[in-house]
UniProtKB/Swiss-Prot annotation:
Record text on subunit structure and interactions: Monomer.
Protein name per Swiss-Prot or TrEMBL: Elongation factor Tu
Positions that bind Mg(2+): T26
The keyword Protein biosynthesis appears for this protein: yes
Annotated ranges, domain tr-type G: 10-205
Domain of life (superkingdom): Bacteria
Catalytic function, reaction form: GTP + H2O = GDP + phosphate + H(+)
Species per Swiss-Prot/TrEMBL record: Corynebacterium glutamicum (strain ATCC 13032 / DSM 20300 / JCM 1318 / BCRC 11384 / CCUG 27702 / LMG 3730 / NBRC 12168 / NCIMB 10025 / NRRL B-2784 / 534)
InterPro entries: EF-Tu_GTP-bd, EF-Tu_GTPase, EFTu-like_2, EFTU_2, G_TR_CS, P-loop_NTPase, Small_GTP-bd, T_Tr_GTP-bd_dom
Compartment(s) where it occurs, according to its Swiss-Prot or TrEMBL record: Cytoplasm
GO molecular function terms noted in the UniProt entry: GTP binding; GTPase activity; translation elongation factor activity
Region called G5, residue ranges: 175-177
Main subcellular localisation: cytoplasm
Chain segments carrying region G2: 62-66
Length: 396
């Protein structure tokens, strides 16, 4: 029986709804699925509002996040859409990366205009690297006065510009509720919103197009053949006989050639992002490499020891710390496959960090780790996860 193959006929884009509580994020999500299911029944099924709103809990690195996933298609694209109903859920999702977003729909109620969480979500989207935001101005059926709508639009554009987002981004007037009720005029506006997503959210750069990178999980010696390292390819593609560097953890990097690639006990000519495989390395002894190092295309990545990160600290209920931590806190930072101890410097004016907080911090690691902006990590004390974060800036 052949496995059902994932059809790669259309570009796949991850998208999400962001915005202030009660401005209609979930209703907008439901309206999109309904209108697309009505318009392109052969491509889509509708998801009921309550199935989206009762978001299942997800465990991402031990942090409980309520998040719902729906998928839908336009004629041009296949979208996977995440909706995090609660504000805390949204923040946790953004920082821990339970769902990566290639673009976001910022939902703003025309009746309220931008509110504190609207601003906070846009700031977070910038910090975690969401590349594009467009706007759904919701509840437009409730505002008679055109001037009010124009004022709200101006405020939203200023907000986007503050965070270096496209000030000229489309702002589509919608009424998610009316569209859900089957109103034809407002249904058309949802289609316009999706057209704006198709036209303005850039096609994502897929992991396979980036330079090769594979974190080492395990190391074996095969008598008579040499050393094999195993792991999951994070980025790029690799062919047999390619040269690679082994970097991170140790002072010096090592160069070698991949003489064989094995997957599910079969020999392959190449490996690509997403594959779990073993690489046979020429002239490398078992003690030359260790878990936590990464195998990379020569010169494509560099190891670093100092960075700034945006971190969510687990609350006591989530299994995190029971007490705050202070400047010079020294936990382990778990990157990809290994822990490295680091020293935390808190931002000026922050005396301490409480469980349940999110904070921006600077970290100095005692060993170098191959990283770039956007890389995620967990913060651990022994085997217990106490926080999750992502690299926002490399210092050294």
């Amino acid at each position: 029986m052949a496995k059902a193959k994932f059809e790669r006929t259309k570009p796949h884009v991850n998208i999400g709804t962001i915005g202030h509580v009660d401005h209609g994020k979930t209703t907008t999500t439901a309206a999109i699925t309904k209108v697309l299911a009505d318009t392109y029944p052969e491509l889509n099924e509708a998801f009921a509002f309550d199935s989206i709103d009762k978001a299942p809990e997800e465990k991402e690195r031990g942090i409980t996040i309520n998040i719902s996933h729906v998928e839908y298609q336009t004629e041009k694209r296949h979208y996977a859409h995440v909706d995090a109903p609660g504000h805390a859920d949204y923040i946790k999702n953004m920082i821990t990366g339970a769902a990566q977003m290639d673009g976001a729909i910022l939902v703003v109620a025309a009746t309220d205009g931008p509110m504190p969480q609207t601003r906070e979500h846009v700031l977070l989207a910038r910090q975690v690297g969401v590349p594009y935001i467009l706007v759904a101005l919701n509840k437009c059926d409730m505002v008679e006065d055109e001037e009010i709508i124009e004022l709200v639009e101006m405020e939203v554009r200023e907000l986007l510009a503050e965070q270096d987002y496209d000030e000229e981004a489309p702002i589509v007037h919608i009424s998610a509720l009316k569209a859900l009720e089957g109103d034809e005029k407002w249904g058309k506006q949802i289609l316009e919103l999706m057209q704006a997503c198709d036209d303005n959210i850039p096609d994502p750069v897929r992991e396979t197009d980036k330079p090769f990178l594979m974190p080492i999980e395990d190391i074996f010696t095969i008598t008579g053949r040499g050393t094999v390292v195993t792991g999951r390819v994070e980025r790029g593609t690799l062919n047999v006989n390619d040269d690679v560097d082994i970097i991170g953890i140790k002072e010096k990097s090592t160069s070698t050639t991949v003489t064989g690639i094995e997957m599910f006990r079969k020999l392959l000519d190449s490996a690509e992002a997403g594959d779990n495989c073993g690489l046979l390395l020429r002239g490398i002894k078992r003690e030359d490499v260790e878990r936590g190092q990464v195998i990379v295309k020569p010169g494509a990545y560099t190891p670093h020891t100092e960075f700034e990160g945006s971190v969510y600290v687990l609350s006591k209920d989530e299994g995190g710390r029971h007490t705050p931590f202070f400047d010079n806190y020294r936990p382990q930072f778990y990157f990809r496959t290994t822990d490295v101890t680091g020293v935390v410097k808190l931002p000026e004016g922050t005396e301490m960090v409480m469980p349940g907080d999110n904070v921006d911090m600077s970290v100095t690691l005692i060993q170098p780790v191959a990283m770039d902006e956007g890389l995620r990590f967990a913060i651990r004390e022994g085997s217990r996860t106490v926080g999750a974060g992502r690299v926002t800036k490399i210092i050294k």
